Amino acid sequence: MQIIRNNSQDPISISNWRWACFLDETIKAFSTFQTRPYQIDNDFLFRESFFGSSSNPKKVILETWGLKMEKIRQARCACLQAGEITSVMNLVISPLNNYDLPFFGADFVTLPNGHLIALDLQPALKDDINHTQHVWNKLKPIHAHWQSKIPSGGDIPSDARQYFSPAFLWSRIPLGEEGDNLITQTIKPAFDEYLNCFFDLLRDAKITSKERSFQLLNGQKKYMRYRAEKDPARGMLRSFFGEVWTESYINNILFDLK
């Protein structure tokens, strides 16, 4: 029976979704604010498909959570579970462009060969110290503490570096007990501290000038275009849901700022 979700703030219903506690923490952080559902068409609130052999089909479910509020244009989370192993959380909190705030980004992916962890407060204007310095001063000590406890994820592609801060938490960790312990003891508290840092910045943010807002908007659009063009989940989503649906989801829901 297909789950019916009436709006983007309705609870995610994926059974045994690995990353549920991270989204729960995000929802809790927003609970002290007046929020509204972000407009997401029903076809993207819940999507179900099957993959594998006809004799042993496996279910894949994707649900999208989202909201908006003062200072936040869009907060949204793509939640996917495919079979028993593959599990994805792609969370982006996008500020309105008349506040000098970074994006909050968390990509947590479980695949048969391990977990990929990416966590950051991502700049819209990386080379602008007025946009970055107050963020990085708060975030760098948090990053240094937690990155030292997990393996590195490897080199960042050169064309992507402008979209990450120096406090980008990036790791590849194994499946099994070791990975489970790292997620519980390191990734979750690191996520909580990054999220708290973002919300501290959010509370303190003051409205900017029209000229500054225009600069921020251009930076945000550039970031969104890059994320849409380079989305690493594109191939997986196409295999599950087809090309047309996937391209609409990426360009009109996940990275929709034009």
UniProtKB/Swiss-Prot annotation:
Molecular function GO labels: cobalt ion binding; phycoerythrobilin:ferredoxin oxidoreductase activity
Catalytic activity: (3Z)-phycoerythrobilin + oxidized 2[4Fe-4S]-[ferredoxin] = 15,16-dihydrobiliverdin + reduced 2[4Fe-4S]-[ferredoxin] + 2 H(+)
EC class of the enzyme, as a word: oxidoreductase
EC nos: 1.3.7.3
Function comment: Catalyzes the two-electron reduction of the C2 and C3(1) diene system of 15,16-dihydrobiliverdin.
Family: Belongs to the HY2 family.
Protein name: Phycoerythrobilin:ferredoxin oxidoreductase
Species of the source: Prochlorococcus marinus (strain NATL2A)
